[in-house]
Amino acid sequence: MTLNLCVLTPNRIVWDSEVKEIILSTNSGQIGVLPNHAPIATAVDIGILRIRLNDQWLTMALMGGFARIGNNEITILVNDAEKGSDIDPQEAQQALEIAEANLRKAEGKRQTIEANLALRRARTRVEAINAIS
């Protein structure tokens, strides 16, 4: 038995295919979803989506949004998403270093909050790459 997974951003469909299982980062922690999962709607945190296709696991960096799960269908609507295999490792590492530097020199609450969010996004992209290597 499989699940139909659809990952959408405002600009494109990132994934629309059948999967065996997913592990999703939510605002209250990670959840695993298998066929016949109880229906839920949940907020999606900045984090990694792990997708199992038979014996292979793929990763995707998700940048926050929400998910609806029910009737063996999963719809994830996020601000942005990238497959781990599509992320340039050098660019992601450089973005992480820039985000860390920006956090160190942030002044005031607003800059600190924005720098922390940028750092979380950059770390998630690097984690998505490292999870597949």
Swiss-Prot record:
Annotated membrane topology: Peripheral membrane protein
Q: What is its main location?
A: plastid
- What GO molecular functions are on record for this protein? ATP binding; proton-transporting ATP synthase activity, rotational mechanism
Listed GO CC annotations: chloroplast thylakoid membrane; proton-transporting ATP synthase complex
Location in or out of the cell: Plastid, Chloroplast thylakoid membrane
- Asked if the keyword Methyltransferase belongs to this entry, the reply reads no
Name the Gene Ontology biological process terms: proton motive force-driven ATP synthesis
Biological function: Produces ATP from ADP in the presence of a proton gradient across the membrane.
Q: Which family does it belong to?
A: Belongs to the ATPase epsilon chain family.
Q: How does it assemble?
A: F-type ATPases have 2 components, CF(1) - the catalytic core - and CF(0) - the membrane proton channel. CF(1) has five subunits: alpha(3), beta(3), gamma(1), delta(1), epsilon(1). CF(0) has three main subunits: a, b and c.
State what protein this is by name.
Answer: ATP synthase epsilon chain, chloroplastic
